[in-house]
Amino acid sequence: DVSDEIRNKIFPIGEGQGIIVGSQIIRDQFTTDDVRRDATFLEIYSKDIETGQPKYYSNIVLKGQGLTKDGYRHFCSDVIIYRYADILLLTAEAKNALNMDPSSEINEIRKRAYKDKYEQHIFTKGTQAENDKAILKERLLEFAFEGKRWWDLIRFDAAFELVPSLSLFNGNKAKLLF
């Protein structure tokens, strides 16, 4: 039993496209006070049969939905190649590689993402490895479902560590080509 409001946001699908459901692994990376969470996912709740209370059912990814007109969904969303947040995080990555402080770029992203809760999420420079980890996570949160994650994992040499299904390949980097 899903509300009409949610049903109207999800359907119609149209033009041969389906719905993308975000994995729990990715959804768990977002904190509830990060505005990117609600811009990335629509959580779907149904009523619990026994209690009548809302119960989490699933989610859909909101990015690239296009628009709905006259009962049809038109997938007309532009594919984003680069945006300002990408430039900031690439700058942070380059600064960190040069042993410079990437805090200002990361914090500029976080100010927008956390708004009035920003003070609880201020980034301060750590070791080069800690900074890399923070930049990689920030890129996940900022660019989820925009086609950048795989290349970030390759560039940071983190694919085997962060993609559980790659454990089958025992670190064989030749398997990372595609």
Question: Where does each model-flagged region fall?
Answer:
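Polar, glycine-rich mid-to-C-terminal structural blocks
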Residues: 1-26
